[in-house]
Amino acid sequence: IRPSNQGSSIGVSILKAVDIMTYRDSINAAFFIEHVSSPVWNAYSKEEKYIWAVEVSDIRGGIGFPVELAEQTIHHPQALVKYLDNYLITNDSCTIEGHMTEQRVIVESFIDGREFSCIVLRNEDQNAVALPPTEIVNSGDIYDYRSKYLPGLSRKITPIAVSDDHLQAIRSECERLYDYLGFHTYARIDGFINAEGKIFLNAPNTPSGMLPSSFFFHQAAEIGLNPSQFLSFIIRCSVPERLKD
């Protein structure tokens, strides 16, 4: 269950069992809505209230600030705590919504497989070329924002440890999607391969992260390019694309 416009790592939940309460909470999370009841709030200590408000304000796991309440827009955790302290004296519960809330959510089946990410380039001959894909081994069920950027929460293995046939199949499918969507210069395509070798491509991305630990540079190293060489190649291939515009 995830928002329709936030990619694959913000507001995402996995429903592991038939549980209406968990389902409701997951839908609310995807809509960036938070409910808090008076009994729960008033049982918190002052420190716990502030910690809760900070967590709600963090878009990576909460709903993000500013938040909308019945009477006003709030921009800071301390202001939210003060508001709830007053509001929940005379009210049973409070509904908090993110300022930029979603209008739709996506409910989709969980793909049980090995997750990968593949950089695809448009070379100087205008052919799509997929680099050796990277497998993402997560400590949890979702490769979310924290797993991407906090050390120790995921491992990256380049290339993904599958048979040569499956490796080539992944690259071919990524190249096919790259051409179908009309990408230019380069893109990152994420997906899964299951135990039967079926490939699911679920997240095409026009840009790719360029941190030192990013797939972008891992995969370039597999074909013998250091970061400077790879960026020079990207720039050289980008210039003709911009001239077309």
Please give the residue ranges for each predicted region.
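Active-site nucleotide/adenylate-binding loops and adjacent lid/helix of ATP-dependent enzymes
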Residues: 1-106, 112, 124
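Short acidic-glycine loop/turn motifs at beta-strand connectors
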Residues: 122-127, 194-197
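ATP-dependent carboxylate activation and anion-phosphoryl transfer catalytic cores
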Residues: 163-245
